[in-house]
Amino acid sequence: MSNWLEKIIPGMGGAQSKHKSNVPEGLWKKCPKCSAVLYRPELEKNLDVCPKCQHHMRISARRRIDIFLDGADRMEIAPELEPADRLKFKDTKRYKDRLVSNQKATGEKDALVAFKGTVAGVPVVAVAFEFNFLGGSMGAVVGEKFVRAVNVCLEENRALICFSASGGARMQEALISLMQMAKTAAALEVMKQRGLPYISVMTDPVFGGVSASLAMLGDLNVAEPNALIGFAGPRVIEQTVREKLPEGFQRSEFLLEHGALDMILSRNQLRRRLSMLISKMMKLPEPEFENEEELEEEEMERPEPPDNVE
């Protein structure tokens, strides 16, 4: 287009290109639900929730940890763990090559990050799935890191919060992956016997072996609005039963209505609500927010959550 303009009006194409190059890339983002064009700095300030339609966009595991935990006194748990291709698995691509490409793309060694820290002064361990790493699938490293996070809770009397975003068990690790379902469930049973709270926060999406194990084993099962949660996907179910599924089937609002969830919390409510719940469950002092007036002001500025949001 610029070459065509250059021929008709000399200098026009070059000027247009120069002007375009001054606009930073990635400054705007389109909402995948309502198609609103959003200014990225404002979107990030709103915790990656669309101010127009309240759509909760998918975020990285570290971004999740950053907006949930307090800024000080954080420590990553088992960052040294790396996956291994024990089965020498190959489908259309070698598993080893998939691991390398996903590690480069995400900056993570595997699909789970774990930190101990505080939420408004309440001591916790928080783990979050990285969906962009092989669909957040659960393999040996994910299971081991989850168990190590549980062990920190047992050693230091902390609550555990898990933010799930996963397609399920990692097929490239076969039975090793399926074993993680039992391994993580057994670790959570020890937490339960010790009376330490485990809060599962399901984000979009949660499926397969993760939804069938650690994601649904919380003392409180929480979800973000409109998250897709289930075992098999809705299209697979429709093809199997050959029936049209109800509107909103497998969305968090549908699950809450039918008793599969305890509550739905919008992203800007998670820190305050969960820290208050944990402090009551563990009989700890009330959470300490730095400036109560600023907190209330922030909440007033943020858009109202949709219906069915606690």
Curated annotation (Swiss-Prot):
UniProt pathway: Lipid metabolism; malonyl-CoA biosynthesis; malonyl-CoA from acetyl-CoA: step 1/1
Known cofactor(s): Zn(2+)
Reactions catalysed, as given in the entry: N(6)-carboxybiotinyl-L-lysyl-[protein] + acetyl-CoA = N(6)-biotinyl-L-lysyl-[protein] + malonyl-CoA
Positions of the UniProt region annotated as Disordered: 285-310
Keyword ATP-binding annotated: yes
Assembly information from the UniProt record: Acetyl-CoA carboxylase is a heterohexamer composed of biotin carboxyl carrier protein (AccB), biotin carboxylase (AccC) and two subunits each of ACCase subunit alpha (AccA) and ACCase subunit beta (AccD).
Protein name: Acetyl-coenzyme A carboxylase carboxyl transferase subunit beta
Organism, as annotated: Hahella chejuensis (strain KCTC 2396)
